[in-house]
Amino acid sequence: MLPSPSVHMASPPPSLNMASHPPSPATASRKRFQDSSKKIMNPSFADLPSSLIEEIMLLLVLKDNIRASAACKSWYEAGVSVRVVDKHPWLMCFPKRGNLFEFRDPLHWKLHTLDLPELAESTVCYSRFGWLLMRKASSNDVFFFNPFSRDIISLPMCELDFQQIAFSCPPTSDDCVLLAIKFVPGEVNRVTVSTCNPGATKWITNDFPTFLRLFYMQSNLVYRRDRFYCFNAEGTLYSFEPSYREWSYICADKLRCPYVHENQYMWCGKAVFLVEKKGELFVMFTCSNEKPMVYKLFSMKWKELSRTTLDGMTFFVSFYNSELRNNLPWMRNNVYFSRFGYNRKHCVSFSFDESRYNTPKEWEQWVELCPPQSLWIDTPKNVLDYFL
C-alpha cells in the first residue's frame, strides 16, 4: 500500500480587518487636525488655561464662586484655590464684678475666658480690628487695649463728655485717628467734636452749628474713605472729615423707616445701626420682634434690601459696634445680636431666609437686643492659644 501523502494545511491570508498596521504620518496628522477643528468649532470652558480660570474666579463673590466650581474639575480646582472665606467675630462679655471676661464663638458657642486685670474699673466705648477703646470710670482717661496681646496704648485725657466715639484703623497705624462727638441742644443746636491721634499730647475740639432736630436715637460711628459717619433715626446721615475739620449732614437723601415714623410701632423698642464694608454704607433698624430692615446707600439714595438682594451678607451688631461679613456660607443672610439666647446656649439671631428669630418664642420677653455688657470683637488666627 502506498503511503498516504501528508497533508499540509496552509494558513489563510490575514483579513484586511485584522491587519494592524500603524497609521501613516499623513493619517495621524489628519486626525489631529480633525480633533483640533472640533475643539475650535465646539469650544469648552474646561479647556481654558488654569491661570485664566483663576482670574475669573477672583472676580466672583463666594456664592458665585461655589456655583462656578461645580462646572468641571478644572473650574473646581481653580475656584477652591482662590476662595476666601471671611473670619467671623467673637462675642466678648464683660463681667459685673471681677476681671474674668467671657469669649464665645457664635458658631460653636464654647465658653473661653481671659483674666484681664488691666480693664479693672474701666468701661468699654468701642471695638474694631481686635482692639478695645476703654475709658476709666473714675476719670476721663481713655486708652486702647488688645485683650489677646495685652498691649496698651495710652491717650491724652479727653475732656469731652462724648456720646459716641470711634477710631479709623488699628492704633498701631500712623494713620489712626479718633473722633468723639456730643450733640448739645440749645437755642441753636450744635455738635462738639474732638479728635486725637495715638502719640498726641491733647485732643483738638471744635463746635459746629447743626440745623438738625436732635433726635433721641443715634447710630454708632463708622469710618469710611477719610470720613466718620453717623446716622440718626430721623433718617439723616451726617459726617465729619478730620483733616479739614469739616462737618456735613447733607450727604444723602433722608431715610424714612416705617418703624420710626408709623404709629403702630410707637411703643416698640427700637435701635439703629450703621455698618461699613469696603466703602459701602448700610443702615439697619430693629423694632421689638419685627424683622430687621436693612438699607444700602446707592448714589446718595437709600435702597431697602430684601432676602434676595442681601446676597448672603452676615451682620454682627452690638451696643458699641457693628460688623459685616460677605463670605460666611454657614451664616449667610443672618443678623447676630450681642445678646444671649435661652439658657445662654447661643446668641439671638435673625434669619432672613426663614424670616424669624432664633428661636421665636425666646424673643417675646425681650426688648433690648444689644445690651451694654457685650460686643463683637475680631480675634487673631491662633485665638485658642490665648485662653486659660
Swiss-Prot record:
At the top level of its lineage, which domain of life is listed? Eukaryota
SUPFAM superfamilies per UniProt: F-box domain
Where is the segment annotated Disordered?
A: 1-30
List the Pfam families.
Beta-prop_KIB1-4, F-box
Q: Which parts of the sequence belong to the F-box domain?
A: 42-88
Which protein, by its recorded name, is this? F-box protein At4g00893
Organism ancestry: Eukaryota, Viridiplantae, Streptophyta, Embryophyta, Tracheophyta
